C-alpha cells in the first residue's frame, strides 16, 4: 500500500457531528407531525425512464437467477414509496441513499442522501408550506418567496415561457451568449431549461429560499397537469443560495396517463440513442389499485446540510465523497 494513501474522510469530524444532529432534527420534525419513516430497496428491477436521469445497473446471479437478473440502483425511492401509499401507509417519509450515474462536483456526488416524503390529501401549495417550515427550522432562514415559472421568466428575461416560439427563445439565448448551444437545439424544453439555468437561477433564492411552481406541462414528469391551466403542471422546485434543494409534485394518480408518459420517455430515449427502460408494471399496478390523491417532494440532504453549515461543497459534509470512496 502506498504510504501516501489518502485515507482520511472528505469532511471534518466536526461537520459530521453537525450532520448527525441535523438528521436527528429532520426525524423529529416528521415524528412530531405523525409521518411514518419507511425503508425501501436501494436496488430494484425497474428504473426511471426520464431522459435526464442515468442509473447504475448491475446483474444478480444468485439462486433462482442463473441467467442473470438486471437490477438498478435507485435514483429515488419514489416508485416503491408510491406502492406503499397505494397499500394504505398514510403519510410517509424516507431518509435514504440514492444513486445517479451522472456528474460529480461541488453540488453533485453519484451516491447521495435523499429526503423524500408524501402527504395524502395535500395539494401542491400545502406541501410547499411544509417544505418552507422544514427549511426555516433547519436553516434558520426567512420564510420563502414563491414565483410561478411564468412570472420568473417574465421578471428576469422579459419573455413568456408558455407561449414563446423556439426562435424567440434562441434570441434570448443569444443575449446570454448561449447561441453556440441554442442554435443547434431543436427541443423546446431543453431551450427553456437552458434559459432557466443561466437567465433565472442566478437571480432567485439569494436572500431567502424561492419556490418556482407551475412548470410547463411538457416538463410535468410525474406531476398532475393543472386543472385551472392545462399549460402548466402541479410541480415546484426550491432554490436557495444558488442551490436547487428540492423538487415536488402533486402526484399523478392516473395509471393510463402514467403509462403513456413512460412510453413517451422511451420514444425520446430511442431517438437519442439511450437505452430504452422497462416500464415499472408494479407502479402501474399500484396506481390501478388506487393511490390516494397526494403531494410529494424529494430534497437533497447533503445540499441542505451544506447550506446549514455554510460549507462550500458537498464533500465538506460527506464522510467520503466519490473521490475517496
From Swiss-Prot:
Residues annotated to bind ATP: 100-102, 109, 244-245, 300
Source organism, top-level taxon: Bacteria
Keywords on record: ATP-binding, Ligase, Nucleotide-binding
Catalysed reactions, as listed in the record: D-beta-lysine + L-lysyl-[protein] + ATP = N(6)-((3R)-3,6-diaminohexanoyl)-L-lysyl-[protein] + AMP + diphosphate + H(+)
GO biological process assignments: lysyl-tRNA aminoacylation
GO cellular component, one term: cytosol
Role, per record: With EpmB is involved in the beta-lysylation step of the post-translational modification of translation elongation factor P (EF-P). Catalyzes the ATP-dependent activation of (R)-beta-lysine produced by EpmB, forming a lysyl-adenylate, from which the beta-lysyl moiety is then transferred to the epsilon-amino group of a conserved specific lysine residue in EF-P.
Name by which UniProt lists this protein: Elongation factor P--(R)-beta-lysine ligase
Annotated organism of origin: Photorhabdus laumondii subsp. laumondii (strain DSM 15139 / CIP 105565 / TT01)
Amino acid at each position: 500500500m502506498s504510504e501516501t494513501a489518502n485515507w482520511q474522510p472528505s469532511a471534518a469530524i466536526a461537520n459530521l457531528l453537525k450532520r448527525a444532529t441535523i438528521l436527528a432534527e429532520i426525524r423529529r420534525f416528521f415524528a412530531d407531525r405523525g409521518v411514518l419513516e419507511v425503508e425501501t430497496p436501494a436496488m430494484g428491477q425497474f428504473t426511471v425512464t426520464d431522459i435526464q436521469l442515468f442509473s447504475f445497473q448491475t446483474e444478480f446471479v444468485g439462486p433462482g437467477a442463473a441467467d442473470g437478473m438486471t437490477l438498478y440502483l435507485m435514483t429515488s425511492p419514489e416508485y416503491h414509496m408510491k406502492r406503499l401509499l397505494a397499500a394504505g401507509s398514510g403519510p410517509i417519509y424516507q431518509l435514504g441513499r440514492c444513486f445517479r450515474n451522472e456528474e460529480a462536483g461541488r453540488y453533485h456526488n453519484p451516491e447521495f442522501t435523499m429526503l423524500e416524503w408524501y402527504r395524502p390529501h395535500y395539494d401542491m401549495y400545502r406541501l410547499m408550506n411544509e417544505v418552507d417550515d422544514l427549511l426555516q427550522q433547519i436553516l434558520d432562514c426567512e420564510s420563502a418567496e414563491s414565483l410561478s415559472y411564468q412570472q420568473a421568466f417574465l421578471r428576469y428575461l422579459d419573455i413568456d415561457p408558455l407561449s414563446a416560439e423556439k426562435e424567440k427563445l434562441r434570441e434570448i439565448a443569444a443575449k446570454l451568449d448561449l447561441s453556440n448551444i441554442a442554435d443547434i437545439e431543436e427541443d423546446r424544453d431543453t431551450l427553456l431549461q437552458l434559459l432557466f439555468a443561466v437567465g433565472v437561477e442566478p437571480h432567485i433564492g439569494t436572500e431567502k429560499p424561492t419556490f418556482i411552481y407551475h412548470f410547463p406541462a411538457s416538463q410535468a414528469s410525474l406531476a398532475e397537469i393543472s386543472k385551472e391551466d392545462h399549460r402548466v403542471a402541479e410541480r415546484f422546485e426550491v432554490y436557495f443560495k444558488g442551490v436547487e434543494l428540492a423538487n415536488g409534485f402533486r402526484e399523478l394518480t392516473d395509471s393510463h396517463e402514467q403509462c403513456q408518459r413512460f412510453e413517451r420517455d422511451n420514444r425520446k430515449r430511442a431517438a437519442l440513442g439511450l437505452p430504452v427502460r422497462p416500464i415499472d408494471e408494479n407502479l402501474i399496478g399500484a396506481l390501478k389499485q388506487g393511490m390516494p390523491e397526494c403531494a410529494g417532494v424529494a430534497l437533497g440532504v447533503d445540499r441542505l446540510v451544506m447550506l446549514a453549515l455554510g460549507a462550500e461543497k458537498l464533500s465538506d459534509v460527506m464522510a467520503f465523497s466519490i473521490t475517496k470512496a
